[in-house]
Amino acid sequence: MSNQVPEKMQAVVCHGPHDYRLEEVAVPQRKPGEALIRVEAVGICASDLKCYHGAAKFWGDENRPAWAETMVIPGHEFVGRVVELDDEAAQRWGIAVGDRVVSEQIVPCWECLFCKRGQYHMCQPHDLYGFKRRTPGAMASYMVYPAEALVHKVSPDIPAQHAAFAEPLSCSLHAVERAQITFEDTVVVAGCGPIGLGMIAGAKAKSPMRVIALDMAPDKLKLAEKCGADLTINIAEQDAEKIIKDLTGGYGADVYIEGTGHTSAVPQGLNLLRKLGRYVEYGVFGSDVTVDWSIISDDKELDVLGAHLGPYCWPAAIKMIESGALPMDEICTHQFPLTEFQKGLDLVASGKESVKVSLIPA
């Protein structure tokens, strides 16, 4: 390694649920075809929080094995500067030392059924940064982009926390793509957190009849308007189902995109949709959800679609951020040094004062 790169660095290390520690670890060594990156910013995602709190999706239960691994550095939404790379990596990704770059959150194997079909976001091994030992994340001063990674350049002229928002925004845009929105649609987005705000912006870009945002926080509903919502509904104070059905001649919404991960948002969406409507689920749930499946089948014949990660949406997400189309200063509300990672996790968990919380490694 060059003289500019230290031998040791600070990093957050996952030892298991409720046991994340700030430690001094060795700076990772890149292999041929890889790039060493100095991390500039890493966002704290709801998935990070649910992993921290021990959700079965990550740590398993009687119905599924554990997916997350211990002794891993968390962090899958990030941006950094290229510190070291070889000619192979430079030519593959079109990058050079000093460039600001992001990497898509999954590092595909490129050998499985899904990768060979171009569905790399569903790669069978499913190595996401920050959850697997093969792919350590960005809650550290340095990280490595493996040779199999998907890498994109980002403008050096925007704040680092804005650039790191490309990851959640790509996810939002993929969920919008799954909805197959048309010009006459009434689109409802549940949740005005980081994912929901991106969904609102993406849905608005599809030029539907109207985009409606649901949340319980007045400040977030105001932010939703700045992201493109034509109507906002505070579900703690207003009857969303009645309002939406009154707007649509009694039919209901054409599209419902769920981005909260709250169990109550699922039956809410099923009830808000018209017959033959489209439900897109992006939320990551901390517990099981029970619904009346007859609404999906016999009552309404709904299309229920999942959405995962942000395949093929990263260039659009980066362009949207760089263009100033989103109120990024109001979305990226809090930044903390790496030493205060626990404060960041706790702030995200409170769900009240923040929208997007980021860590800024020294």
UniProtKB/Swiss-Prot annotation:
Enzyme Commission number, as recorded: 1.1.1.-
Stimuli inducing this protein: Up-regulated during growth on erythritol, D-threitol or L-threitol relative to growth on glycerol.
Leader sequence segment: none
GO molecular function: carbohydrate binding; metal ion binding; oxidoreductase activity, acting on the CH-OH group of donors, NAD or NADP as acceptor
Disruption phenotype: Complete loss of the ability to grow on erythritol or on L-threitol.
Binding site for Zn(2+) 1: 45, 76-77
InterPro entries documented for this protein: ADH-like_C, ADH-like_N, GroES-like_sf, NAD(P)-bd_dom_sf, PKS_ER, Zn_alcohol_dh
Cofactor(s) required, per the database record: Zn(2+)
Pathway, per record: Carbohydrate metabolism; erythritol degradation; Carbohydrate metabolism; L-threitol degradation
Binding site for Zn(2+) 2: 109, 112, 115, 123
Entry binding sites for NAD(+): 195, 215
Name by which UniProt lists this protein: Erythritol/L-threitol dehydrogenase
Organism: Mycolicibacterium smegmatis (strain ATCC 700084 / mc(2)155) (Mycobacterium smegmatis)
